[in-house]
Amino acid sequence: YSPSMKYKIDFEFPVGTPWNITREVFDNAVLEAAGDVGAEIMTETRVSDFEFNGGVTVKTSKGEFHSNMVIGATGPNDKLAGMVREKRKIKPWSDNQMGTALMWEPVVGKEFVDNVYGDNRSLLVHFKPGGIEGYGWVFPKQDILNIGFGGYNRTIKSVKVKEIWEDYIKLLKKDGYFPKDQDIPPVKGAPLPLDGPIKATTMDNTLLVGDSAGMVSPLSGEGIYYGMHAGKIAINTIKKALETGDFSQKQLDQYHRDWNKVFGKELRDLSFFALMALKLPERMVYYGYRDEKLCEIFADLFLGVTPGGLGKRKPISRALYDAIRY
């Protein structure tokens, strides 16, 4: 839906895509898979500091650990990422580059989801809820609704988030997309980097992966695909470092080149497309409403269904084409 609710894009994905799963189930499955191949899982363990002295010493609430390599993958506020930034002279993210996502997964019952969202589990996206430079969403699952909204901090900080959250739930209730008798929950959220990947993701003995490195789609907020793909690339880099005994920044920079070659341009292009979509959402939804091809591109990229294929999609040139045509 466009901000005015005047224009609406309807698009039906091929059977079988996308799949929705609760984040808790997904995270636990990944954790178990790591344990199955030999990773030692340490819960309730906080990292307090890192020391580099020919290797790396990780100081935690359960003692110190020594290694040749450490990987930062704890999100945009990752302490290790801050150290890489300082070492490589990269400025911290500003409010113009950061966003906040608020999310809630209430159980509403399979009958409600079936009746309202159908067998195909229709997904909802509303642009600019409450004037925020971002979007609200509802992703139905079996008996659960994933509800949330996200946007740039530059606009979120200037409004009352609680009021916008409540207004968005009221809108969903009014339109029948949420049970009218269900209470509105307290608001809670998490930070998101929305300016594309940082310019350096390595230093001696160190790699950054996922949100810590800014590997997030500025359009959809999708980061799992990029983080997991970067993780695979990191494994190959670390294997070579172990074989040669060279854990220097120069050696590890191959990791940065490799992931950048795979999806770096995609994330940079998405940054530009997101700027167009979030700055001019009424216009962009209108173009999608008029142009079936842009509608398909928009739905695909926005919902993160086929990340890694942006180059074939050409969303920017299609949007510019529609701007001239309409």
What are these regions (language model features)?
Residues D27, G72-G75, D211:
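Acidic active-site catalytic centers that drive phospho-/nucleotidyl reactions
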Residues Y1-A29:
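A conserved beta-strand/loop capping segment in the N-terminal third of enzymes
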Residues D49, I132, N153-T237, L242-E243:
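FAD/FMN-dependent oxidoreductases across multiple families
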Residues E32-Y177:
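Predominantly flavin-linked oxidoreductase catalytic cores and closely associated redox partners
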Residues Y7-D10, I147, M215-P218:
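Short small-residue beta-strand/loop micro-motif enriched in glycine and branched aliphatics
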Residues K239-Y326:
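C-terminal helical "tail/cap" subdomain of flavin- and related membrane-associated enzymes
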